[in-house]
């Protein structure tokens, strides 16, 4: 019997698929082959949550528990790894996962060293980003319900064990019963205790009951909460009740803060900090190339290899030639804050030092002191002092506050000179809200606050107003930079460039840039007015 052409093609295709399937199975399951999925060995730890991890109070540890594997599997194991899916051969139409092992970018000795330094940076990041409001607090059973006051967090669409739940009933009862109600998630248990009745597993309303109080409390240690609604930053206020008593507590639903870490630099011999590896100097220039070159020359006297980033919106730009200068050009008159954004966007170091283009470094411009402050405190930004030719030095320490106004009128901004308190461990340094235009800051925090490019002519304190409440600011009066003299002797020739600069830099009270700034503050920050001392 002869096969027609279609049947023959189908038979050939079937045999080819079968051969590929057998080849795939044999290579995947062949004994003695190295496992292609294992990229690296993660830090040794328990491969999964075991019974000891679920027994938080020793007094209930003797009560047996039947673990619910499907629920325990939803909990964070704190032992992640990255594995590819599939075998050696990439088969068509099959979705596969590709894993990348970042540790392969280092040799063994370098990996050990960089892992230690990364952990040190991470712990410093946690110390800066966490507060007392994040700590877990358990309310004692005064009601007689014990429950967490704060500090319970779950990632969106993830599950956690809920800590601290307990019933401390003084009177003997036939049945001890508690109830949990959520609105944005569901309840379950990671294990079942014999003698405890559960109603509502996998639902938003869970009831637990038992004639034996210890067994009920052992079961409460195994209660899990699962986020069921994707909201990146919210909270579920849940209710926990027993007969005659009800309490409420909050479960935060959010992603943990994602660190932005910078590798620590090696220290040159005899130096406290490698400034060139830690700091980039950033400035915005407009027309004043003589002042800019003087600034660069003064920096090179003390920091020969530090990178300098320049944002330039001059009409006829002049290129600055220096092996460690990055010069970026902008449209003419683009603006003061737009230039700041451009300069900061190109910084790759942990810290950025902001300076005006007419500053001059001296022996008192000790960047090491400012770096030391940021390395050893949770501050995000620390300013220095600017010394005028008269010898007077200013730190421009400013306190900012916003007072609520009447409905519909907007709030009132209060600005006054001063500081909140001294910075412990650093003489001549204080904590404040705003500082002079000479400061060292964490690069990621400056980018987070940003400079509003709508402020294009005159602006400074507006940056600190944008950062009020999120930017931790300090000031040290003993780190000083000089300000080039603005005094013009009458017998010297006029500088057309300086006159043009002055027209842009010092607009009158009725200039449209000032009006635009006031309109912006009115709407953006919902302000009706401000006072300044």
UniProtKB/Swiss-Prot annotation:
Cellular location(s): Golgi apparatus membrane
Intrachain disulfide bonds: 429-476
Organs and tissues of expression: Strongly expressed in brain, testis, spleen, and to a lesser extent in liver.
CDD domains with a match to the protein in the record: Glyco_tranf_GTA_type
GO cellular component, one term: Golgi membrane
Domain of life: Eukaryota
Residues listed as glycosylation sites in the UniProt record: 79, 274
Main location: Golgi
Lumenal side: 26-533
Membrane topology: Single-pass type II membrane protein
Pfam families: Glycos_transf_2
Catalytic reaction equation(s): a ganglioside GM3 (d18:1(4E)) + UDP-N-acetyl-alpha-D-galactosamine = a ganglioside GM2 (d18:1(4E)) + UDP + H(+); a ganglioside GD3 (d18:1(4E)) + UDP-N-acetyl-alpha-D-galactosamine = a ganglioside GD2 (d18:1(4E)) + UDP + H(+); a ganglioside GM3 + UDP-N-acetyl-alpha-D-galactosamine = a ganglioside GM2 + UDP + H(+); a ganglioside GD3 + UDP-N-acetyl-alpha-D-galactosamine = a ganglioside GD2 + UDP + H(+)
Parts of the chain that traverse the membrane: 8-25
InterPro entries (alphabetical): Glyco_trans_2-like (IPR001173), GM2_synthase (IPR011143), Nucleotide-diphossugar_trans (IPR029044)
One BP annotation, GO: nerve development
Annotated metabolic or biological route of this protein: Sphingolipid metabolism
Membrane topology, Cytoplasmic segments: 1-7
Record-stated family: Belongs to the glycosyltransferase 2 family.
Subunit structure: Homodimer; disulfide-linked.
Known role: Involved in the biosynthesis of gangliosides GM2, GD2, GT2 and GA2 from GM3, GD3, GT3 and GA3, respectively.
Name under which the protein is recorded: Beta-1,4 N-acetylgalactosaminyltransferase 1
């Amino acid at each position: 019997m002869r096969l027609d052409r279609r049947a023959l093609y189908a038979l050939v295709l079937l045999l080819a698929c079968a051969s590929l399937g057998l080849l795939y199975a044999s290579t995947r399951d062949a004994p003695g082959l190295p496992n292609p999925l294992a990229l690296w060995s993660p830090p040794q730890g328990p491969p999964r949550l075991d019974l000891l991890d679920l027994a938080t109070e020793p007094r209930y540890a003797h009560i047996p528990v039947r673990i619910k594997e499907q629920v325990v599997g939803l909990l964070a194991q704190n032992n992640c790894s990255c594995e590819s899916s599939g075998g050696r051969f990439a088969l068509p139409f099959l979705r596969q996962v590709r894993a990348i092992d970042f540790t392969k970018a280092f040799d063994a000795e370098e990996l050990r060293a960089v892992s230690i330094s990364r952990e040190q940076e991470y712990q410093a990041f946690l110390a800066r980003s966490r507060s007392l409001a994040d700590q877990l607090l358990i309310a004692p059973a005064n009601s007689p319900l014990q429950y967490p006051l704060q500090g319970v967090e779950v990632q969106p669409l993830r599950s956690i064990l809920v800590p601290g739940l307990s019933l401390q009933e003084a009177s003997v009862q036939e049945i001890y019963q508690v109830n949990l109600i959520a609105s944005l998630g569901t309840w379950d248990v990671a294990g079942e205790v014999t003698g405890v009745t559960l109603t509502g597993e996998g639902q938003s309303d869970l009831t637990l009951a038992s004639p034996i109080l210890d067994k009920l409390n052992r079961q409460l240690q195994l209660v899990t909460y699962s986020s069921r609604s994707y909201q990146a930053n919210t909270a579920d206020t849940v209710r926990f009740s027993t007969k005659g008593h009800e309490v409420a507590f909050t479960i935060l639903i959010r992603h943990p803060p994602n660190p932005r870490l910078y590798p620590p630099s090696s220290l040159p011999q005899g130096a406290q900090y490698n400034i060139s590896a830690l700091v980039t100097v950033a400035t915005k220039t407009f027309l004043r190339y003589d002042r800019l070159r003087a600034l660069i020359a003064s920096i090179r006297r003390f920091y020969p290899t530090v990178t300098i980033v320049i944002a330039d919106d001059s009409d006829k730009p002049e290129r600055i030639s220096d092996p460690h200068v990055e010069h970026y050009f902008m449209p003419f008159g683009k603006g003061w804050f737009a230039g700041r954004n451009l300069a900061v966007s190109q910084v790759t170091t942990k810290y950025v030092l902001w300076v005006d283009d007419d500053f001059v470094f001296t022996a008192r411009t000790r960047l090491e002191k400012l770096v030391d402050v940021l390395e050893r405190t949770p501050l995000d930004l620390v300013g220095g002092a600017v010394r005028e030719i008269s010898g007077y030095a200013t730190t421009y320490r400013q306190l900012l506050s916003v007072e609520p106004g009447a409905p519909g009128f907007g709030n009132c901004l209060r600005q006054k000179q001063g500081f909140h308190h001294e910075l412990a461990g650093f003489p001549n340094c204080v904590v404040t809200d705003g500082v002079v235009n000479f400061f060292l800051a964490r690069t990621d925090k400056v980018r987070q606050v940003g400079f509003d490019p709508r402020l294009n002519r005159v602006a400074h304190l507006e940056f600190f107003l944008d950062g009020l409440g999120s930017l931790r600011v300090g000031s040290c009066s003993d780190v000083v930079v000089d300000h080039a003299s603005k005094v013009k002797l009458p017998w010297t020739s006029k500088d057309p460039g300086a006159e043009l600069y002055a027209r842009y830099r010092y607009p009158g009270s009725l200039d449209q840039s000032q009006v635009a700034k006031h309109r912006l503050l009115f709407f953006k920050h919902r302000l009706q007015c401000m006072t300044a001392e």
